[in-house]
Each structure stands twice: as structure tokens, then as C-alpha cells.
């Protein structure tokens, strides 16, 4: 073979060897990639399995963890919406809900330690008070009892012993019965409180009934006054202004009686007072005109629609968007949480049913009106204006029964709130008596204003007039003209209606 052919043959062999070696190298790479792909899939599968198992374990563990940890449903204290009006617990709701200790600024452990220390000191004071009572030193005993009550106001033994002291040494059986009632609320099996309550309950009920009979007699005496009597007309017009002045004043409005009168008569602004204070007066004015025109002599039930219409006018100048609408947010007051917005529909439906139930109509009108006020102010269905609306409802019910509207004086606001709190704790009778006392003072003022005889000035008139019987600022005097313009309209007086 020639050298050229031999060279060509050797080159061909070399190329075949090179090609064969490259093929083996590419095959190895493909096998390596297949192996790495399978390994990557295995790694991802293992990691995914571990992650899934971990998540399953966490989800399975979470419920048991939540069950052992006390939940914090409430936001931080600085985000709480604090309402300015009092409310009480509804009788048909099971119990009050209190804010967690973490929100009241004092550690729970320190609170418990302070409570135990106060209780020990209270019991020591109680022991000495009982000794002073036996020695006939009633003044010292009274101060010691009051000190013990201030330290531990919910201790059943202190409540019972203090009640016995009031009943036997102070002849105050009504307050004594209330303390026996409170003691049984804390400890229903307290033997002494049970025995005392069995003795006093019927007596106190009889006294309450006599109070209502006295109110009925005064109401009947006022009903005998001719509707066109000049004194009655002046009294009605002044009561209209006084009701607005005191009702907004209870909620913190700083307008004086003269300024309130000026706004209602002239509709002119008062210097130095906020727009909201003006609008609160105008809103209550509109609500009372609506009540006089529609509800006082309405021969039908009072419905939720009526309540919403009252509230729509109460807030009509302050917050027209919220006026006549149930609140849509949770609100908080002190240590109590009112019903949530989701419960308002059913609670207000129950309230409407109670308001128009035959059993409710059988109550004395003053008790019925006071309880309606109590129930509505607890449910707190509105974002604002609950107290004003509740007082308007109470007076609507009283006027439909022939009573004048009750004037709850702003200087008695703390007593008013205290009695609501007592009702919150389970005994509504003190609040009913408070409303009865306000009703009697108002009746006395009407009777004095319409009487031709020279009677002493009623207590309410003395407080408002500062002892000046004929003072023009008060406007209830029998002599001279009324301080309210005669042309202010029929809606500018509170009229006494009749029961349907």
C-alpha cells in the first residue's frame, strides 16, 4: 500500500476512535444528569414532606395551646372608645363582662393582695363597730360600719351587720333591706341575711306601694287643674326648658339655664360655648316636640320605630349620620362591656316585646317608666345619646299615664349614676325609688305653681331659684308673666297626656 493510502487509513482510524470516545463521554454526562435530576426530586420530596409534617403538627397543637392561654379580645386601652353615658346590665342577660386586669393598670396579683388587706381591715372595723353598737355608741359605730363598707363593699357579713344596725338603730328599714338583698346576691345561703330579708321584704314592699299611692293622689290633684289655667301653662313651659337644661347637663353640657332658655327662644348662638353644646340643646328640643306631637296621646304601642325617630332628632344636629341608627361598633364604659353590635337587633326586639307586654302594663306607671329607662340605657343601642333617649322614653311613658315629665336635676347626676350602678348589681328598687322621688318633687312644683294658696316653695324650686320665690330666672312663679314667649309654639311645652 502506498504511503498516501496508509496515511488516510490511519486518519480514519483515529477519527473513529475520537468519535467513539466522544460518544461515551456524552452518554456519561446524560446518565449523570438523569441521576442528579432524580436526586433533586428526592431532595425536594423529602423537604416538602418535612414541611407538611411540621405544619400539620403546628395546626394540631394550636387549639390546645389556645385553650390554655387566656385570650385578649380587647384592643389596647388607648384605642378604646369611652362613652360618656352610664349603662347598666340587662336583667335578662346572664352576667356582666369586665375588662381584663391587664387593661386597668394594676397587676392582678397586687389587686388580690390589696383586696385581702382591705378585707382584713374591714372585718376588724366591723368587730369594733358591733362592740360600739352594744355599748350604745351609735355615732362611733356608724363611722366604723361606713369605714368597713368602704373597704369591702361586697362582703356579705359586713352588708348584713350594717343592715341590722341601720334597721334597729337608725330605723332605716328600706336601706337595710337593700343591704340584705346585696348580701344574698353575693352569698345566697347566708343564714342571717335570709332571716332578715324574710322579715323586711314585705314591709319594704308595703312602703313602696304607699309611695306610689301618694304619687297617684298628687297626679290626680294636678289632673283636676283646668288645662287653660295660667299657672299650669307657665309650669309646662318652664318644665320644657328645665328638662332640656338638666338632661343635657347630666351629660356634661355647660350651658346655664339662662343660656339654654335664650337658645330655645331666639335660636341665637351663645358666645364662648361650643357648637356641639348648642346642637345638643336643639336636638333635644326637636325630640321633645316630636314626642308632644305624636307619642304622648298615641293610642297604640310604642315601637322600635318610635324610639329610632326620637334618637334621630336627639342627634339630628350633633351627628345626623348616626341619628336613628343602631351602633355598628363595640363601645366600652368603665369596667363593663355592653352588648356587641351583632346582638342589638335581638335585644331591642326583646325590649320592644317587654315594653308592650300586658304584664308590663300592670306595673305602676312610675315603676314601669323607670324600668324602661334602666333596660334601654343598658342595651346602649346607639353610638351616642343613649341617656337622653332613655330619659325621653321614660317621660313619654309617664306623660301617657297622666304624670308630668320627671326632671332629674344635673346636680344629682352622681346619685343618678350611683343608683343605675346599684341596679347593675342586681337591685333595681333603689333606682325606681329615686325616679319616684324625682316625680314627687316635680309634682310638688306643678301643684305649687298652680295653687292659689300660700304654700312653702317646693325643694326643686328652692334649689333652682336660690330661695327667691318670684325670681324671673326660674319662671315658675304664680305672679307676673312667664319668661317663655307665648308665641313659641305648642311644641315648646310639656303636655300631660292620658294612658291609652
Swiss-Prot record:
Keyword Disulfide bond: no
Entry keywords, A to Z: ATP-binding, Hydrolase, Membrane, Nucleotide-binding, Nucleotidyltransferase, Repeat, TPR repeat, Transferase, Transmembrane, Transmembrane helix
Regulation: The side chain of Glu-251 determines which of the two opposing activities (AMPylase or de-AMPylase) will take place. In response to endoplasmic reticulum stress, mediates de-AMPylase activity. Adenylyltransferase activity is inhibited by the inhibitory helix present at the N-terminus: Glu-251 binds ATP and competes with ATP-binding at Arg-391, thereby preventing adenylyltransferase activity. In unstressed cells, disengagement of Glu-251 promotes adenylyltransferase activity.
EC number in record: 2.7.7.108, 3.1.4.-
InterPro entries to which the protein is assigned, alphabetical: Fido, Fido-like_dom_sf, Fido_containing, TPR-like_helical_dom_sf
TPR repeat positions: 122-155, 156-190
Compartments in which it is found: Membrane
This protein's name: Protein adenylyltransferase Fic
Amino acid at each position: 500500500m502506498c504511503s498516501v493510502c496508509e496515511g488516510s487509513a490511519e486518519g480514519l482510524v483515529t477519527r473513529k476512535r475520537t468519535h467513539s470516545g466522544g460518544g461515551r463521554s456524552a452518554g456519561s454526562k446524560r446518565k449523570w444528569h438523569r441521576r442528579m435530576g432524580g436526586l433533586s426530586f428526592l431532595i425536594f420530596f423529602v423537604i416538602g414532606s418535612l414541611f407538611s409534617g411540621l405544619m400539620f403538627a403546628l395546626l394540631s397543637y394550636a387549639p390546645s395551646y389556645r385553650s390554655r392561654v387566656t385570650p385578649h379580645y380587647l384592643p389596647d386601652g388607648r384605642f378604646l372608645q369611652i362613652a360618656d353615658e352610664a349603662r347598666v346590665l340587662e336583667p335578662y342577660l346572664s352576667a356582666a363582662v369586665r375588662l381584663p386586669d391587664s387593661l386597668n393598670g394594676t397587676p392582678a396579683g397586687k389587686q388580690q393582695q390589696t383586696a385581702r388587706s382591705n378585707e382584713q381591715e374591714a372585718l376588724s372595723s366591723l368587730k369594733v363597730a358591733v362592740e360600739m353598737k352594744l355599748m350604745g355608741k351609735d355615732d362611733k359605730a356608724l363611722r366604723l360600719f361606713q369605714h368597713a363598707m368602704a373597704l369591702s363593699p361586697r362582703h356579705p357579713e359586713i352588708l348584713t351587720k350594717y343592715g341590722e344596725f341601720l334597721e334597729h338603730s337608725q330605723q332605716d328599714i328600706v336601706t337595710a333591706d337593700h343591704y340584705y338583698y346585696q348580701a344574698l346576691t353575693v352569698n345566697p345561703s347566708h343564714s342571717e341575711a335570709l332571716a332578715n330579708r324574710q322579715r323586711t321584704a314585705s314591709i319594704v314592699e308595703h312602703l313602696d306601694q304607699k309611695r306610689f299611692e301618694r304619687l297617684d293622689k298628687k297626679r290626680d290633684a294636678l289632673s283636676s287643674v283646668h288645662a287653660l289655667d295660667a299657672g299650669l301653662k307657665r309650669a309646662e313651659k318652664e318644665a320644657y326648658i328645665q328638662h332640656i337644661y338638666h338632661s343635657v347637663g347630666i351629660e356634661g353640657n355647660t350651658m346655664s339655664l339662662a343660656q339654654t332658655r335664650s337658645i330655645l327662644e331666639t335660636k341665637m348662638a351663645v358666645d364662648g360655648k361650643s357648637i356641639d353644646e348648642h346642637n345638643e340643646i336643639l336636638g333635644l328640643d326637636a325630640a321633645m316636640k316630636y314626642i308632644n306631637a305624636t307619642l304622648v296621646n298615641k293610642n297604640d304601642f310604642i315601637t322600635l320605630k318610635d324610639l329610632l325617630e326620637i334618637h334621630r332628632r336627639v342627634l339630628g344636629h350633633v351627628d345626623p349620620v348616626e341619628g336613628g341608627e343602631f351602633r355598628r361598633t363595640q363601645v366600652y364604659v368603665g369596667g363593663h362591656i355592653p352588648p356587641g353590635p351583632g346582638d342589638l337587633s335581638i335585644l331591642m326586639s326583646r325590649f320592644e316585646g317587654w315594653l308592650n307586654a300586658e304584664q308590663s302594663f300592670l306595673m305602676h306607671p312610675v315603676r314601669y317608666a323607670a324600668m324602661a329607662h334602666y333596660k334601654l340605657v343598658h342595651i346602649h343601642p346607639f353610638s351616642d345619646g343613649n341617656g337622653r333617649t332613655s330619659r325621653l322614653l321614660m317621660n313619654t311613658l309617664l306623660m301617657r299615664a297622666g304624670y308630668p315629665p320627671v326632671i332629674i336635676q344635673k346636680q344629682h347626676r352622681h346619685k343618678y349614676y350611683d343608683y343605675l350602678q346599684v341596679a347593675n348589681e342586681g337591685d333595681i328598687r333603689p333606682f325606681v325609688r329615686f325616679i319616684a322621688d324625682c316625680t314627687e318633687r316635680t309634682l310638688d312644683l306643678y301643684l305649687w305653681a298652680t295653687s292659689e294658696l300660700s304654700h312653702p316653695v317646693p325643694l326643686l324650686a328652692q334649689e333652682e331659684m336660690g330661695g327667691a320665690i318670684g325670681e324671673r330666672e326660674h319662671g315658675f312663679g304664680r305672679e307676673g308673666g312667664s319668661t317663655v314667649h307665648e308665641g313659641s309654639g305648642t311644641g315648646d311645652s310639656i303636655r300631660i297626656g292620658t294612658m291609652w
